[in-house]
Amino acid sequence: MASLRELRTRIKSVNSTKKITKAQELIATSRITKAQARVDDAEPYADEITRVVQRLAAASTLDHKILQEPTDASRAAILVVSSDRGMCGGYNNNVFKKTAELRKRLENEGKDVVLYVSGNKGISYYNFRGEDIAGAWSGYSQDPDYAATHDVRRHLIDGFVAGSEGTAKWREGLKAEEGQAVQGFDEVHIVYTRFESMLSQKPEAHRLLPIETVVEEEKFELGEDLVSDKVDHIAADYDFEPDPDTLLKALLPQYVSRGIFAAMLESAASESAARRTAMSAATDNATDLVKQLSRVANQARQAQITQEITEIVGGASALADSGESD
C-alpha cells in the first residue's frame, strides 16, 4: 500500500487534472452552441443554391464535367477532415477508419488515391505512418472560416476540372513546390463527421465530384386523379437571365464549395460535442478516482492512528510494569 503522503499527493494531482477537464468541458459546451448556430445559419443558403442548381440542371443542355458520371476514372482525391487538437475521444480515429474503408474500396476499383488532410491530428497521423499527403491545411477546425478554407476548396475544384491528365495551379498548403503545376484527379471524395446530436456524431464519406445525381420520386396525395386528363394546376416554367448554361457554369463551383464548407461546419460542431463528452467522462472518472484514493487514504490514516495508539498504550504498560518491579 502507498504511504499516506503519496496518496495525498496523488489526490492533489487528480483534483488539478479534474479542474482542467471540467474547464475544457465548459468551453466545449459553449462552442457547440456557436457551431450549431453556424450550421443552422448556413442551411437557408445551402437549400436555396441546391434548389437553383437543380432547376438549372433540368433546363440546361450544358455538358459540364462536374455533372458527368465518370467512365474511366483513374485517380481519386480524398479530403480528410480531422481536428487540430486532441482530447475529443474517438472523433479522429473514427474519421481515419472511415477513410481507410473508402481508400480500400477506391483502390480495389483500380484508382490511385491522393490524400488531402485538414487538421493537425490528421496530418500527424498520416505523417507518423509514412503516408504521402498531397496537401495539408490546419488552424481552423474548431471555427472554420470561409476565407481560411479557400485554398483547399478551390484546389479540389480546379484539380477535378483539370482531370488526371491535366494539371491545376499551385495553392498554399500543397506539398508541391510553389509555382509547380499539380496533377489533377477524376473524382473528389470527402470524409467528415456529421453532427446528429450532443451525444451522437457519425463519420460520413461521400463523393463530392462529380455531383451525384439524385432522382426524387413524385409524390401523389390521397384522392388525386391519376387517370383522367384533368389537371388542377400547371407547374410554371422559369425564364433565366442569362441563359441556364451560363448560370449553371457560374454556380456549380459555388455549389461544390458550399458543400465542402458545410462539411467543415458539421465537423466543427461534432468536434466540440465529442470533446465535451470526453471531458465530461474524464471529469466523472477523476471524481470517482478521488473518492477511491480518499477512502484508501482514510484507511491508511486510521491504521496509522491505531498503530500510534497501540504504541502509546504498549509504552505506558511497559512503564507501569517497570515501576511495579522497582
Curated annotation (Swiss-Prot):
<comment type="subunit">
    <text>F-type ATPases have 2 components, CF(1) - the catalytic core - and CF(0) - the membrane proton channel. CF(1) has five subunits: alpha(3), beta(3), gamma(1), delta(1), epsilon(1). CF(0) has three main subunits: a, b and c.</text>
</comment>
<dbReference type="InterPro" id="IPR000131">
    <property type="entry name" value="ATP_synth_F1_gsu"/>
</dbReference>
<keyword id="KW-0813">Transport</keyword>
<dbReference type="GO" id="GO:0045259">
    <property type="term" value="C:proton-transporting ATP synthase complex"/>
</dbReference>
<dbReference type="GO" id="GO:0005886">
    <property type="term" value="C:plasma membrane"/>
</dbReference>
<comment type="similarity">
    <text>Belongs to the ATPase gamma chain family.</text>
</comment>
<keyword id="KW-0066">ATP synthesis</keyword>
<dbReference type="Pfam" id="PF00231">
    <property type="entry name" value="ATP-synt"/>
</dbReference>
<dbReference type="InterPro" id="IPR035968">
    <property type="entry name" value="ATP_synth_F1_ATPase_gsu"/>
</dbReference>
<protein>
    <recommendedName>
        <fullName>ATP synthase gamma chain</fullName>
    </recommendedName>
</protein>
<keyword id="KW-0375">Hydrogen ion transport</keyword>
<keyword id="KW-1003">Cell membrane</keyword>
<keyword id="KW-0406">Ion transport</keyword>
<dbReference type="InterPro" id="IPR023632">
    <property type="entry name" value="ATP_synth_F1_gsu_CS"/>
</dbReference>
<dbReference type="GO" id="GO:0005524">
    <property type="term" value="F:ATP binding"/>
</dbReference>
<dbReference type="GO" id="GO:0042777">
    <property type="term" value="P:proton motive force-driven plasma membrane ATP synthesis"/>
</dbReference>
<keyword id="KW-0472">Membrane</keyword>
<dbReference type="GO" id="GO:0046933">
    <property type="term" value="F:proton-transporting ATP synthase activity, rotational mechanism"/>
</dbReference>
<comment type="function">
    <text>Produces ATP from ADP in the presence of a proton gradient across the membrane. The gamma chain is believed to be important in regulating ATPase activity and the flow of protons through the CF(0) complex.</text>
</comment>
<keyword id="KW-0139">CF(1)</keyword>
